[in-house]
Amino acid sequence: MAAALIEAGFEVDDVHLSEIGSKIKDLNSYRGLVIPGGFSYGDVLGAGSGMSNTIMFNTKIRKIFSEFLSNEKNFGLGICNGCQFVSGICEIVPGAKSWPSFMRNDSDQYECRLVQLKIESCSSIFFNGMEGSVIPVSYT
């Protein structure tokens, strides 16, 4: 993920949650927060909740993330388990209270389902200029 972001022109820094909580690094010195997959707590449903619960149940860290996400100049992106993480903190993400949650499917296993996703007009830096594009996405 870091290589892709660098290739796209972003400056990248690896930051551990403990560095934010202990104020070794200041989240407000960044403009973006990208949480990739990576098998945090295993590659299973709910794996992202370990990190999201760390934020939601720690008043100090929750406030830091809430302030960062409330700044309209900042952006966030969650991929794979990172998407589960972002879903787990949606309570502090402006405009995200109605987001869907992840649930187990009937087989309790990963099942690839290919769907087409149409990009609507939006202010996302990731979809700028892609309005009307239809892209394939797999999900379980």
Show where each model-derived region lies.
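Histidine-centered catalytic micro-motifs
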Residues: 137
